[in-house]
Amino acid sequence: MQHLLTWHGHANFQIATEGANILIDPFFEGNPSAAAAWQGIAKPDLVLVTHDHGDHVGQTVEICRETGAMMGAIVGTAEKLAAAGVPQQQVLNGIGFNIGGTVLHNGVAVTMTQAYHSSESGAPAGYILTLPDGFTIYHAGDTGIFAGMELWGRLYSIDVALLPIGGVFTMDAKQAALACRLLRARSVVPMHWGTFPVLEGNTARFKEQLMNFAPDCRLFDMKPGETLTLETASEGCACD
């Protein structure tokens, strides 16, 4: 089974798989790295938000209202977004869910993980998505490295990890490379870099550190607007 992973810049990813189209941290307006407007992307049926900072909430309310997509977030942040205009009936699990919990959406199991960051409501989080054929994607959200990544790597067979490398507000390149080893990730897509001058400007240091800490982890060095075709571990991957 094939899955399509599109990076819209920063922490904004879209995953298209059989029966589901999932958008994570839909920061389009005000995102200098976004290659498209939210009105021009494929229609999502689920929007996931890792925490309530503006560069991650983005246009969640507008997208959910326009498309009818469900919205998933931690309890507290889900309440805040419902108050901001996401229709209550579109909130996943009615009130959101919490760290360690799993909800099902159109054949995709969405598991919430912890993240070490800040958030005005709820708590920051990440997501492990187990697609219908078992292919597994981890979106770390904004986080520093934490020892519990090793536990998630033992619990789940992570095919692709989406990890921040920008530093200052999240992990830097060295921490993210070690995170790949803790997670036992088969491949990694670096994110949360290059969007603003304060962040790491490119992936060069991460490439170097990945060779030191997790040389068997395959690097997909995506550019904003690029789509990656993902397949089962026995098959190949290709960038469009």
UniProtKB/Swiss-Prot annotation:
Disulfide bonds: none annotated. It comes from the Bacteria. GO terms for molecular function: hydrolase activity. The keyword tRNA processing does not apply. Keywords: Hydrolase. Belongs to the UPF0173 family. This is UPF0173 metal-dependent hydrolase Dde_0151.
